[in-house]
């Protein structure tokens, strides 16, 4: 299977060879990354609308990741349900003179999850593989489940460097983690050229990256058994219309949803697709 670039053309530089394998059962995982959207009042309204439906969807781990200002309000609304709450970022230090930052201990008061290394953090705020790794280790220390993002830019994709970049980000971001705790980590593959553009990768090509790059790197880090237990999400313009196609792939274990998570009907439909 040839890797396709963002324009959908065959990329001769890199070829992913399909391999036969038996999928280990992993609970599907759907997280909504609201990014810098919704006031506290708007967050309450959105959760009130979609929370009732989401609570009725079983066999899927469902997580909401609103902006920091809305974490407490959303926590109060979803308390006692099976909905999880996640932060969109955090610092690796416990406390100190880090103006504008939030520590893992502060996040732990309300959240169970935290997104780390999102492409927008890497692009706009200088996030590196090293800082992602520091944050991951700090998150684990505080009992938070990290959702670690990896993915290539448009230029890297068109240059045939997808495997190189994604493998490096996976190996460097997750180094120093012991195999016993690695299975709790969630990895999200987000091709940067597909985020917010409406140009999702094909399900087949996303599967090839999940299987032949991300999970292969996880096997090198932690061994085959642990690697098979780690969930790998797809995050790149996932919608209600294309979610089922992605979720049908053996190594796509859910989605990190951006814009569609701000629309109750869309996010509910995506969660339902994951439950099938």
Regions found by a protein language model. Give the residues of each.
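Active-site loop-to-helix "anion-binding N-cap" substructures in soluble metabolic enzymes
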Residues: 18-276
């Amino acid at each position: 299977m040839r890797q396709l670039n963002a324009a959908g053309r065959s990329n001769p530089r890199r070829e992913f060879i399909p391999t036969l394998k038996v999928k280990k059962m992993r609970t599907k995982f759907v997280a909504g990354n609201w990014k810098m959207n919704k006031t506290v009042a708007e967050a309450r309204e959105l959760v009130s609308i979609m929370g009732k439906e989401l609570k009725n969807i079983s066999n899927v781990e469902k997580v909401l990741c609103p902006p920091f200002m809305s974490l407490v309000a959303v926590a109060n609304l979803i308390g006692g349900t099976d909905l999880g709450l996640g932060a969109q970022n955090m610092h690796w230090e416990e406390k100190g003179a880090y103006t504008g930052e939030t520590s893992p201990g502060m996040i732990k008061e309300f959240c169970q999850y935290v997104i780390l290394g999102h492409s927008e953090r890497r692009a706009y705020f200088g996030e590196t593989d090293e800082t992602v790794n520091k944050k991951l280790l700090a998150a684990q220390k505080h009992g938070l489940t990290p959702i670690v993002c990896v993915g290539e830019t448009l230029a890297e994709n068109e240059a045939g460097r997808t495997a190189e970049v994604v493998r490096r980000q996976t190996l460097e971001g997750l180094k120093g983690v012991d195999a016993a705790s690695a299975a709790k980590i969630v990895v999200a593959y987000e091709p940067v050229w597909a985020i917010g553009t409406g140009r999702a990768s094909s399900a087949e090509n996303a599967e090839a990256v999940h299987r032949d790059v991300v999970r292969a790197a996880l096997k090198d880090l932690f061994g085959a058994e642990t690697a098979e237990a780690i969930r790998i999400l797809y995050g790149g313009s996932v919608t209600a219309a294309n979610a089922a196609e992605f979720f049908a792939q053996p190594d796509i274990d859910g989605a990190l949803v951006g814009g569609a998570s701000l629309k109750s009907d869309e996010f509910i439909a995506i969660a339902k697709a994951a439950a099938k």
